[in-house]
Amino acid sequence: MDWRSDAAQNRDAWTKANAEYTDRNALASWTGDPHWGVWQIRDSELGVIGDVTGLDAVELGCGTAYVSAWLARAGARPVGVDITPAQLATARRCMAETGIEFPLVEADGADTGLPDASADLVISEYGASIWVDPYRWIPEAARLLRPGGRLVFMCNSTISILCAPDGDERATTTLQRPQRGMRRFDWGEEGVDFQIAHGERIELLRANGLEIERLLELYAPEGATTHEYYGFVTAEWARQWPAEEIWVARKR
C-alpha cells in the first residue's frame, strides 16, 4: 500500500474528527497544563517533557498543535507539522486567541522538509507516532535531531491493540489478533494507524541511532471515566492493563 493513500485516508479521518471534537476542545488544551493521553495525566506527575527553555523542537503530527503551544509557553521554539489543513486552521485560530505563535508546516510527518539536525526535541503525542509507518517517521525524527537531542512520543499500548476487535469496538479482555506481524491497521473511516511490538520498536530506534531512556506504561487513574470521544478502551479496562505508552529516546 502506497503511503500517500494512507495519508489521504488519515487526512479525511482527522478532518472529520476536527469537526466533531478537536476544534471545539483545542483552546482548552492550548491553555491548560501539559498532560498526556486520554486520561490527561499531567506531565508534572510523569516528568517527561522536562526543561525545554531555549530548545528547538519539532512536533510530528501536531494536529491542533496544543503540545507545541505548551512547549512555546515553556520557552522552547517549536515547529508544528501536520497533513490536515482543518487542524492547522484550528491551530492558527488558537494562536490568534492566545497570542502564542510558532511556525506550522503542512507536511507528512515522515517528509517534513525541515533541515537536518535542526531540533533538540522531536515530540509526538498520538501524531506521526501512530498515524505514520514507524519505518518512515522514526528515521525522519532521527534525521531532524541533533546529537544528544531527545525523541519523545506516545502511542497505543501493544496489549490494547492485541485486544482490539476489528471495527470500532472497544478493547476486550481477550486477545483478538496475533502479535506476530502486527504493523498496519486499517480502521476504515477512522483512518490507518501503525503499531509494532516492543522488540521491533527497540531494534528500529537503535538502528536509527536512538538510545532508549524511558518507557512509561500508562493506566487509567482511579476515578477516571471513559473518554467521551476516544473510547478505544474503557476506564475499567485501562485500570487493569496499560492503554498507552510514552517512549523517550536520545540521539547518539
Where are these regions (language model features)?
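Conserved class I S-adenosyl-L-methionine
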Residues: R150-R183
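A short acidic, Gly/Pro-enriched loop at the edge of an enzyme's catalytic core
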Residues: A110-L121
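A short SAM/SAH-binding and catalytic strip from SAM-dependent methyltransferases
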Residues: L121-Y135
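A short glycine-rich, Lys/Arg-flanked "PGG" loop and its adjoining helix->strand segment in the class I
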Residues: Y135-R150
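Conserved alpha-helix/loop element of class I SAM-dependent methyltransferases that forms part
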Residues: A26-L55
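N-terminal, positively charged/glycine-rich alpha-helical extensions of SAM-dependent methyltransferases
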Residues: M1-A28, G32
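Short alpha-helix
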Residues: G191-L215
